[in-house]
Design a protein with these regions (language model features):
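Charged, low-complexity N-terminal segments of organelle-associated membrane proteins
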Residues: 1-2, 96-103, 120-130
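Juxtamembrane low-complexity tails/linkers enriched in Ser/Thr-Pro and polybasic
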Residues: 3-16
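Hydrophobic alpha-helical topogenic segments used for membrane insertion/localization
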Residues: 16-41
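Transmembrane-cytosolic junction motif
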Residues: 35-55
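Short, flexible active-site loops
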Residues: 41, 109-111
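Short edge beta-strands and adjacent turn/loop segments
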Residues: 51-54, 58-109, 149-151
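Short, non-transmembrane amphipathic alpha-helical segments
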Residues: 60, 112-138
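Polar/charged, Gly/Pro-rich intrinsically disordered segments
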Residues: 138-189
Length: 189
């Protein structure tokens, strides 16, 4: 427990501002710094997950257009699927490979299309999405887990493309797709 004289010495060492004008100036300066930091901070900056989602969606839309142009669906002049949205989660961990997990929500189009043709188209779209994620310009190597859904029901997942599991490791992706775009010299150990 402190005695009165020790407490008095400590309180004497603490600087005091007793000038009202000085206190007002410090208060205004504090408000100014707070306002400046709020204005300078980017408020609507998107994260890596959003950039990956945009990249995958763009690749899927381009793939659908190419498939229709090449006539891969016979006499049908519309794509079998329409991309509603792409939900991506990029999980980075210390000492572990980054995991890119995505779900593309699709709507079925072109009712006259045969189911086997629609399923094959979905596999092609998932393969395009996996390649887009693997060839990203930001990080490598990555683990990829992806699937396509329609009405909360899985249409196709990584196993339908012949991968060994739902989460595909970088070594297996390298075997099929080569080196990632971010690090073209990368090879599995």
């Amino acid at each position: 427990m402190m005695n009165g004289s020790a407490l008095q010495r400590i309180s004497d060492d603490i600087p005091r501002i007793s000038n009202p004008l000085g206190l007002a100036a410090m208060g205004i300066a504090t408000l100014g710094v707070g306002a400046a930091l709020t204005r300078l901070r980017p408020s609507n900056r998107e994260g890596r997950s959003q950039r990956f989602a945009r990249m995958i969606e763009a690749r899927l839309r381009a793939t659908l257009e190419k498939q229709v142009t090449r006539g891969e669906y016979g006499n049908v002049n519309s794509a079998p699927w329409d991309v509603d949205r792409c939900e991506v989660q990029v999980n980075e961990g210390f000492g572990k490979p980054t995991v890119v997990s995505f779900t593309v929500v699709m709507t079925a189009c072109g009712e006259e299309l045969a189911e086997d043709l629609r399923a094959r188209a979905a596999q092609g779209l998932l393969a395009a999405a996996v390649e887009a994620a693997w060839r990203n310009p930001e990080i490598a190597p990555i683990v990829i887990e992806g699937k396509l859904q329609n009405d909360d029901e899985d249409i196709v997942d990584m196993r339908a493309l012949g991968y060994s599991s739902l989460q595909v490791r970088p070594e297996e992706l390298f075997e099929r797709l080569g080196a990632p775009a971010f690090d073209s010299g990368w090879k599995p150990v």
